[in-house]
């Protein structure tokens, strides 16, 4: 958690507290955060969704009585609202994020004591821990490949869960070319294809129509091409994707002998520990979709929560799926 990281690094924490539908009664909450774990240094509070200056006066009084510095607030502003959907915030090209950030910055400058905030952050807090950059701490050293690779990355409204750090790592391996499965780009010539996560279920109809690209991906895989697919990217590699609304199944690339469905979807979330061939792997699970595999395909590993409880999410080791033609894969 962010609190654990703050404790390990011995850095101050500024809490952003929603003041919606609360006033002075927020005092016990603030007091609890301050005293629950003394190793986590709560340095100040910024309130969000404050309705008026008089509302803020009650909140500031709560901070005084709880013994925590009040740094300011953000007023309730319609223009700062970002709608959410099942995997997070709705960020689209239709809305300028720069405009939203500029508006937020203007409000922060007006209602938050930035001098006090910066003073808190600039203090010297010696860190008691050091993490050597080695495989012994779970962080392996990274050496760029001598051979420069050609890397193709899907990036469009359906595939956009991309971490900047991953792009930096891939850039060290070679040159990057972006393409769009949704808008019908051709598959670039590549040594590695990266299909990141996103919302393919919202664009299943458009993806289903990209026969040329799907056939190119399939041929690439059959000829030994390397594909890194995460979450939504893996959904694109299945035989079909069934949409939540209407229950229509759309044919995908068919590279994996699996089907994916959003019907009856529920949240799968949490830290995971996997036992596989004598190895223990750790990671994080976060998805709503379900994979449907042939009965003859068993899960190859057991998966456990951080508390040691076994979870039902299967893990498959798939051979490349082949069928005579794309028509046979259409459902």
Per-range role (PLM):
Residues 2-18:
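Inter-motif core of Ras-like GTPase G domains
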Residues 11, 68, 223-225:
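A short helix->loop->beta-strand "cap" motif at the edges of active sites that frequently abuts
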Residues 24-134:
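Internal gly/pro-rich beta-alpha loop/helix module
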Residues 148-150, 252:
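Residues that mark the start of a beta-strand
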Residues 150-154, 158-202:
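Phosphate-binding active sites in nucleotide-utilizing proteins
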Residues 200-275:
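Cysteine-nucleophile active-site neighborhood
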Residues 265-304:
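C-terminal hydrophobic structural anchor segments
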């Amino acid at each position: 958690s962010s609190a654990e990281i703050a404790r390990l690094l011995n850095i101050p924490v500024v809490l952003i507290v929603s003041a919606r539908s609360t006033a002075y009664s927020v005092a016990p909450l603030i007091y609890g955060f301050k005293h629950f774990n003394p190793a986590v240094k709560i340095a100040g509070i910024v309130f969000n969704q404050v309705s008026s200056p008089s509302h803020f006066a009650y909140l500031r009084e709560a901070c005084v009585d709880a013994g925590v510095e009040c740094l300011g607030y953000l007023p309730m502003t319609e223009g700062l609202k970002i709608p959410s959907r099942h995997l997070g915030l709705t960020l689209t090209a239709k809305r300028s994020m720069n405009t939203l950030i500029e508006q937020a910055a203007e409000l922060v400058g007006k209602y938050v004591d930035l001098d006090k905030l910066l003073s808190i952050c600039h203090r010297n807090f010696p860190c008691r821990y050091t993490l050597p950059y080695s495989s012994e701490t779970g962080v392996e050293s990274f050496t760029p490949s001598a051979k420069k690779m050609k890397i193709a990355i899907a990036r469009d409204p359906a595939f956009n869960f991309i971490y900047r750090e991953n792009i930096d790592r891939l850039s060290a391996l070679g040159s990057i070319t972006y393409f769009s499965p949704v808008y019908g780009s051709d598959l670039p010539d590549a040594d590695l294809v990266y299909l990141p996560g996103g919302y393919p279920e919202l664009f299943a109809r458009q993806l289903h129509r990209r026969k040329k690209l799907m056939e190119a991906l399939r041929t690439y895989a059959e000829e030994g091409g390397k594909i890194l697919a995460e979450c939504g990217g893996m959904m694109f590699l299945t035989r079909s994707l069934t949409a939540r609304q209407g229950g229509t199944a759309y044919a995908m690339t068919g590279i994996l002998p699996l089907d994916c469905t959003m019907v009856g979807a529920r949240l799968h979330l949490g830290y995971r520990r996997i036992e596989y061939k004598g190895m223990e792997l750790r990671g994080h699970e976060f998805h709503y979709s379900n994979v449907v595999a042939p009965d003859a395909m068993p899960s190859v590993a057991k998966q456990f929560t951080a508390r040691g409880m076994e979870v039902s999410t299967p893990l498959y080791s798939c051979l490349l799926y082949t069928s005579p033609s794309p028509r046979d894969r259409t459902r």
